[in-house]
């Protein structure tokens, strides 16, 4: 890992940031899910408290953040939580193709699938994704009386929501299940409500996430990941994505990492070098997301606490 000589000097000055660092700035893109918000503020906290730089946070979906990073003008400089292969189309275009975005080589491992509460799983003997197609199970998940059980497949703008919409079709569940897109807070409230009422509810779930600390839930079994049965075309690649996709197996494990505008190395080189060394674990992200979602703490609060509690790890990221 490269040594940051200038950072060593800066680290010895507790009350003031050097003017050279004050000149460096970064705009951090903040996706909607709690883990991404937590990571965004960890990045920002380290930039401000340890590097002495200036930080701005801009909310946005995946497409907007990648397009802004591609422009390289500082409108948005970094995406805090890139899931691959979910967002592979953006990486193919902007990282591999145009080279305008740089992808971190320090990912943590993510997992995703479809879940129900443990109580509902036990009560209705629901352990496999195909169990959602049993009429009595679908009826127990139908809260609005339209004849179909509800399944939250993700938030608007999420690539994973598109994957799950195709999954519902290709697992033969469309006659029984209604795919729903809504913000994640709606999903969390619905899970809590369904457990309290003893109702069924299926939902997209992933690790790391606060959900595993908040509720007793189980991920449903799916056929093992098979590339031949997992051909996903995203809308930004083809408007006929739904008809050209086929997803009938479990998602592969995910590599999750940050990505930043390649031009940041010229505009804010110290920050860019820190980004290249930045590294978290799935456990880090789950715990911070839990503090936000279950305990009502702000991303700023959990990020500051994490940075203070992990000073040695931060030192390593800064080359100290």
Please give the residue ranges for each predicted region:
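Short, polar/charged alpha-helical segment
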Residues: 35-53, 166-168
């Amino acid at each position: 890992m490269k040594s940051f000589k200038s950072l060593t000097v800066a680290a010895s000055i507790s009350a003031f940031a050097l003017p050279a660092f004050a000149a460096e700035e970064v705009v951090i893109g903040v996706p909607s899910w709690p883990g991404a918000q937590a990571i965004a503020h960890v990045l920002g906290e380290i930039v401000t408290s340890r590097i002495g730089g200036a930080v701005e946070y801009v909310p946005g979906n995946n497409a907007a953040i990648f397009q802004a990073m591609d422009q390289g003008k500082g409108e948005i400089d970094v995406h805090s939580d890139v899931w691959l292969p979910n967002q592979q189309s953006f990486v193919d275009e902007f990282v591999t193709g145009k080279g305008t975005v740089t992808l971190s080589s320090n990912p943590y491992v993510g997992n995703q699938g479809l879940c129900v509460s443990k109580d509902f799983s036990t009560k209705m003997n629901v352990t496999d994704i195909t169990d959602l197609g049993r009429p009595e199970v679908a009826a127990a998940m139908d809260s609005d009386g339209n004849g179909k059980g509800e399944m939250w497949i993700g938030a608007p703008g999420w690539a994973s929501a598109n994957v799950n919409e195709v999954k519902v079709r290709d697992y033969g569940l469309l006659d029984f299940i209604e795919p729903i897109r809504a913000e994640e807070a709606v999903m969390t409230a619905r899970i809590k409500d369904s457990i309290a009422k003893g109702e069924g509810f299926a939902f997209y779930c992933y690790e790391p996430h606060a959900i595993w600390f908040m509720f007793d839930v189980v991920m449903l079994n799916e056929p093992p990941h098979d590339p031949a049965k997992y051909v996903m075309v995203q809308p930004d690649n083809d408007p006929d994505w739904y008809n050209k996709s086929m997803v009938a197996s479990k998602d592969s494990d995910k590599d999750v990492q940050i990505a930043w505008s390649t031009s940041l190395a010229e505009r804010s080189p110290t920050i860019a070098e820190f980004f290249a060394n930045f590294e978290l674990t799935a456990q880090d992200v789950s715990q911070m997301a839990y503090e936000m979602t279950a305990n009502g703490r702000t991303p700023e609060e959990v990020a500051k606490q994490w940075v203070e509690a992990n000073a040695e790890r931060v030192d390593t990221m800064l080359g100290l």
